[in-house]
């Protein structure tokens, strides 16, 4: 085969016909053959002659990519045909080396992503193995304990946090026993988890007692102590039962770890030296570093602290002492410092840390805001905040009344802000219209006329001549000794009948006006009784006798002359 034959074999279909049509005579045989061919065949021949198709399997590659996207769930299966057609059209329209290189780059990216995913999975194999082995270890443990179930479950959660977050900790199992290996600066620490949990089984529910703490501590093996020490780095308040031995020992271990991290301020000095080397101010460098490491503001926990039953009783006793000292006028700092002087020594030794933290908080509250401290002491339901042990106190600042004349202008909230007295307020009073006022005046005039008709009308001088003067001179002219027992009383049946008729008329009268019920009650006459009460001062008889039996007259006159009636402000009307 010659070179020309080889070229013709490799040439695309239709290129030769197009070349013959271009090289032959005008309107020749080759030109007429191409002109009379179907339009689709003629178009395909021209396209193949102008842009020959690639022979590197573009269609197969596009099909593989579309199939892979469908298998990964990136596209729906019913969209494969349309997407494949569009991609082929774009590839054939822009069929060049750039398209082929783009497709190859996409394939390389897919291969690189798969390799990176495999590497990440291999890197997480250790973490997955640790979590799996730790789950197997928990499944092999006892599920319940006699006392301290909350501590048991909380400690398992802390152990899982430790294993998942510490990169140099590895859990492994051997012959039914599980252990954790911790690599520290080239040396390793092996802790047998099975033995540690068996050692802790009788201690889960132990209480923190200053007397029994040495006995409980003697039961802990070095293996168990090491486990408690490492796990305590993830301890937080509320993870275990308050007042228990494990809760206090974990808290003490965590405070020891925190104090040991930067006991001499080495970390702060290193930061300062680094900032100086970078020609930055230390405060700016420290703020930037804190933002990069933390990227959030620390908000102290203000929720009430969970206390044990013993701590609850101790808190109530101490707050009761502070309330009494506040009533007695004892200075707050002295009362807080001496509030434990009458505590039982064993109780104080057991709760020494809690009492000292409480004193620190109360002293800080009293120093920052005495009003807030007084409110805490007087509140019987107050509980210390969760920041009692951490020192992150949230205490409102006291307002300084320097620009006002008196604190009374900005005193505490009034009673109206807490109590709603609207339920007990009297209802709105309805004012009388003109017709009702006229009717009320007519009723009053009718009552007054009826009373005058029943009781009679006299002048003040005539009434005194008929009642007071005879009584005064009767004792002076009498030559016999008189007393309250031998004085005959005049009949008063007519007066009682009149009083009953007046009372019946008063019951039919509506005396309620805008002034409230009983506003016209002073108009009612007072009816005298059958018992003599005596004369007024200065009008007593000259004869020495006790009582007022010598007074004569009707019952109404005796009632008028009664000193008690005068003191009550009752008066008889005169016209």
Curated annotation (Swiss-Prot):
Pfam families named in the record: Hex_IIIa (PF02455)
Keywords linked to the UniProt accession: Capsid decoration protein, Capsid protein, Host nucleus, Late protein, Phosphoprotein, Viral genome packaging, Viral release from host cell, Virion
Domain of life: Viruses
Positions of region (Peripentonal hexon-tethering domain): 1-95
Post-translational modification: Cleaved near the C-terminus by the viral protease during virion maturation to form the mature protein.
Matching InterPro entries: Hex_IIIa, Hex_IIIa_N
Positions of modified residues (Phosphoserine): 497
Disulfide topology: none
Residue ranges, annotated region (Binding to hexon-linking protein): 129-243
Site entry (Cleavage), positions: 514-515
Region spans: Disordered: 525-549
Propeptide stretches in the record: 515-575
GO cellular component: host cell nucleus; viral capsid, decoration
Subcellular location: Virion; Host nucleus
Induction of expression: Expressed in the late phase of the viral replicative cycle.
Family as reported in the entry's similarity comment: Belongs to the adenoviridae hexon-linking protein IIIa family.
Miscellaneous notes: All late proteins expressed from the major late promoter are produced by alternative splicing and alternative polyadenylation of the same gene giving rise to non-overlapping ORFs. A leader sequence is present in the N-terminus of all these mRNAs and is recognized by the viral shutoff protein to provide expression although conventional translation via ribosome scanning from the cap has been shut off in the host cell.
Known partners and oligomeric status: Interacts with hexon proteins; this interaction tethers the peripentonal hexons to hexons situated in the facet. Interacts with the penton protein (via N-terminus). Interacts with packaging protein 3; this interaction is required to promote correct genome packaging.
HAMAP family on file: ADV_CAP3
Function description: Structural component of the virion that acts as a cement protein on the capsid exterior which mediates the interactions between the hexons, including the peripentonal hexons, and reaches all the way to the penton vertices. Two hexon linking proteins IIIa, one from each facet, stabilize the unique edge interface between a pair of facets. As the virus enters the host cell, hexon linking proteins IIIa are shed concomitant with virion acidification in the endosome.
Full protein name: Pre-hexon-linking protein IIIa
The organism of origin for this protein: Fowl adenovirus A serotype 1 (strain CELO / Phelps) (FAdV-1)
Taxonomy of the source species: Viruses, Varidnaviria, Bamfordvirae, Preplasmiviricota, Tectiliviricetes
